[in-house]
Amino acid sequence: MNEVAAPEWTALKSGVYQDASGKAVFYGQGSVGKDEISQDRKTLSEDRARDELAKVFTSYMERLVEKILTSRSDIPLTDVNNVQLRNSIEEGAVTILMEATITNHWLNPDNGKVYSMAELDLRRLTDKLESFNSISMEDRSFLEGTIVAAHASMTNGTVGQVAMAEERIDVQPKFDRLLSY
């Protein structure tokens, strides 16, 4: 039996990356084994990829809050402002995570394992800043720089090129997904 070579992206771990074009991204990878009981292994692998992406993004958001708080040590935040900052960031994170896309699927014909890759572009977060009219231009500029710096601090210069897989499972957006939050 000839083994099929897996696409390069299946070797990437969920995490914070610069893609081959230099774009700042977050990846979440999910998989489902052939022996796992599920009527729709593709959907389950997508859900696991989104879950992984949410873990990565949550870790990133914690780093971002730390960077904001330490960068602005000259302007001490009150406890109320600190809580407001954290709450605003958490609310924005949930909205932004809903914009994540499943970019790859692959079915390993050798073992039946289904892989999915979820991606979120950092630009979604910086674009979100533009909609906050209550934030001054100076603060928006500071936040945008901090957002990019927090991402860069987590990549450690890692570049991950994600090549599209030869699709063995139909890659379609999931429009009938029920949100549990």
Where in the sequence are the language-model features?
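Domain-level marker for long, solvent-exposed, non-transmembrane regions
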Residues: 1-181
